[in-house]
């Protein structure tokens, strides 16, 4: 099974080698058919502490690194 890749915005870089990325998804409400926005935060591994708050990044699924980290940052979007 291929690894999932998500795109989001870094909302916190206070932890050592970890960033918190907010990923937003949009979908049509099943009854109202209005576009709804929902977001979720993922902790992602940042080996060199190179990503800062506000950066748009891609994160990829990986083996568990800690209790909460199962994602790693692969690239920043231009």
Curated annotation (Swiss-Prot):
Annotated GO MF terms: rRNA binding; structural constituent of ribosome
GO biological processes: translation
GO cellular component: cytosolic small ribosomal subunit
Keyword terms, alphabetized: Ribonucleoprotein, Ribosomal protein, RNA-binding, rRNA-binding
InterPro entries named among the record's database cross-references: NA-bd_OB-fold (IPR012340), Ribosomal_uS17 (IPR000266), Ribosomal_uS17_bact/chlr (IPR019984)
Assembly: Part of the 30S ribosomal subunit.
Function in brief: One of the primary rRNA binding proteins, it binds specifically to the 5'-end of 16S ribosomal RNA.
HAMAP family: Ribosomal_uS17_B
Family: Belongs to the universal ribosomal protein uS17 family.
Entry-linked NCBIfam families: PRK05610.1, uS17_bact
Protein name: Small ribosomal subunit protein uS17
Provenance organism: Agrobacterium fabrum (strain C58 / ATCC 33970) (Agrobacterium tumefaciens (strain C58))
Organismal lineage: Bacteria, Pseudomonadati, Pseudomonadota, Alphaproteobacteria, Hyphomicrobiales
């Amino acid at each position: 099974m291929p690894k999932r890749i998500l795109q989001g915005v870094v909302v916190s870089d206070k932890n050592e080698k970890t960033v918190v990325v907010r990923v937003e998804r949009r979908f049509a409400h099943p009854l109202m058919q209005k576009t709804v926005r929902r977001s979720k935060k993922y902790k992602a591994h940042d080996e060199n502490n190179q990503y800062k708050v506000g950066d748009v990044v891609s994160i990829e699924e990986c083996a568990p690194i800690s209790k909460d980290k199962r994602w790693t940052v692969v690239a920043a979007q231009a």
